[in-house]
Amino acid sequence: MRLLGLYRGIDTVELAHNAIALIESEKPAAVVVDATGLGVGTVDELKHCVYRRLVHEFMAGGKAMNNNKHANKRAEAWDAMRAALTAGIELPDDPDWETDLCGTEFGFNNKGAIQLERKDMMKSRGLPSPDLGDSLAMTFAVNVASSLRIPAVSTPINVQPGQELNRWMR
């Protein structure tokens, strides 16, 4: 796992052009773009290029596939990311990753579904928006597993029947 770029303070068209350059150099199976707020312009721009079939819109507040387990798509993606990290995916040794991944709290909504802490609440606790964490989580929002080879987990996870892992990274 490696970070290919971090873009801040550029317009949506420039971001789309940077994404196209990365698509051409890295040849990904899918490109997941945050389609909330300013990201919608980037999605629109990418949908007009030759790589449009690779582009998947991510709506963080959208409906989860299993809304009994996850309050929204963001919670669903973070839960999928947690499972992948538990299975052994390695991240760069960088304190920014740790801050983003460990700073986000979670709880349960009134229906018992996993719900992540809102970004304004994180800000009130003195934490920045978890941009790296959200970006990584979005990569688990699209199922491209059929085209990828996932390495076997070297250490089995002991989960008792009926027990669910419900901590992100702690």
Where are these regions (language model features)?
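Mg2+-dependent endonuclease catalytic cores in nucleic-acid-processing enzymes, primarily RNase H-like
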Residues: 1-113, 157-170
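Charge-patterned, long linear interaction tracts outside catalytic cores
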Residues: 93-156
